Amino acid sequence: MDASPAQPQQLIASEAEYRSAIDELLGLAQREVCIFDRDLGRLALDAKERSALVEAFIAADSLRRLRIVLHDSAVVEGASPRLRELIRRFPGRIELRQTPDELRHLADSLLLVDGQHGLIRFHVDHARSKRVLADPVELAGRLQRFEDLWEASAPLSLGTVLGL
């Protein structure tokens, strides 16, 4: 294992590197994780190991928050039982919002951790991304963008699915 410190910024070119960066950043989270994405499909928060990272983060302290802004909630509603269970178990700590129609053209993705670390996917259909560690100045504009999207978006209430 390489003991050298991680580069503060790293360009990412593959899906494998992207997934690795997601796991790295979720492991660093101490207060808040903010996500903006089309549908969470590429972030795969419902994958077993990644879901465990999200659960460990959110369960560690009642003040921790996960805020998610989505264009489309279909993946969360239909193919994310682990994430839906976390939302049920930790009400108020995990919040989802959906963008209004006029913002659905936005095609990037953001994963922002504690205002310090981030993963910026330049276009949701391409792996090309940038991972930023311990650089709040670099991420300030992205954080403001997330807050603007959050304010412009409507709260998303996931319906309860009853098994009959």
Predicted regions and their residues:
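Amphipathic coiled-coil/heptad-repeat helices and related helical stalk/stem segments
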Residues: 18-19, 50, 79, 142
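Terminal leader/tail segments of proteins
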Residues: 16, 56-57, 65-66, 147, ...
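Acidic/glycine-enriched edge-of-secondary-structure segments
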Residues: 1-16, 31-44
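Primarily the HKD phosphodiesterase
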Residues: 25-90
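Signature of lipid phosphatidyltransferase scaffolds
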Residues: 12, 122-164
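Charge-rich, low-complexity N-terminal segments
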Residues: 4, 24-25
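Short beta->alpha connector loops
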Residues: 16-18, 101-102
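HKD (HxKxxxxD) catalytic microenvironment of the phospholipase D
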Residues: 33, 95-142
